[in-house]
A protein has these predicted regions:
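OB-fold ssDNA-binding interfaces and closely related basic DNA-contact patches used
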Residues: 1-84
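Intrinsically disordered, low-complexity segments enriched in proline/serine/threonine
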Residues: 16, 59, 64-66, 89, ...
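Acidic, low-complexity, intrinsically disordered interaction modules
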Residues: 57-65, 92, 101-105, 130-131
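Short acidic, glycine/tyrosine-flanked loop/strand segments centered on an H-E-D-like triad
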Residues: 75-100
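Short nucleic-acid-contacting surface segments enriched for D/E, G, S/T with interspersed K/R
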Residues: 92-121
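OB-fold/S1-family single-stranded nucleic acid-binding modules
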Residues: 110, 115-117, 121-148
């Protein structure tokens, strides 16, 4: 099974999703990210619109929430939105989606969290984000269900 197929199966992305611009338009509608998810809470512009980034693509203008998935993909190279079950963390997958994968290590080491403290995106390797006694925890794809 190709990694792209495994990712679609695990995340619920539609069959045939390949990460093209059209796919992302479709999936951005499906996986709508709450505006508060990637922003400094309650930060608004003069018109009262919530600002998604301190510096958006057009010098700080508000970004419609349906565009966030596509922008995160652009910002991280080949990122694919995996899940958004936290108000401020978005988990992305990056890498070669055509390589073969197995059940034990389906996502390799290419899972990242995107944290947005105060509206600024910051990439953190997933395995470094979960620690116990100061040491990174070993994880597998089941951990994706436990991200909070």
């Amino acid at each position: 099974m190709k990694l792209s197929e495994m990712r679609n199966k695990v995340t619920g992305l539609p069959d045939g999703f390949a990460g093209t611009k059209k796919d992302w338009k479709d999936v951005a509608e499906t996986f709508r990210i709450e505006k508060a998810a990637i922003l400094e809470k309650d930060k608004k512009d003069e018109s009262g619109e919530v600002i998604l980034y301190k510096k958006g693509p057009k010098q700080g203008q508000p970004v419609p929430d349906r565009q966030i998935a596509m922008q995160l993909r652009t910002a991280s190279g080949e990122a694919v939105l995996v899940r958004t079950n936290s108000p401020r963390i978005v988990t992305l997958y990056t890498g070669d989606l055509d390589r073969e994968c197995d059940e034990v290590n389906r996502f390799g080491d290419r899972i990242y969290h995107v944290e947005a403290p105060e509206g600024e995106l910051k990439f953190v390797p997933y395995e470094m984000d979960k620690k116990k006694d100061g040491k990174p925890l070993k994880w597998d794809v089941a951990d994706l269900e436990e991200v909070d």
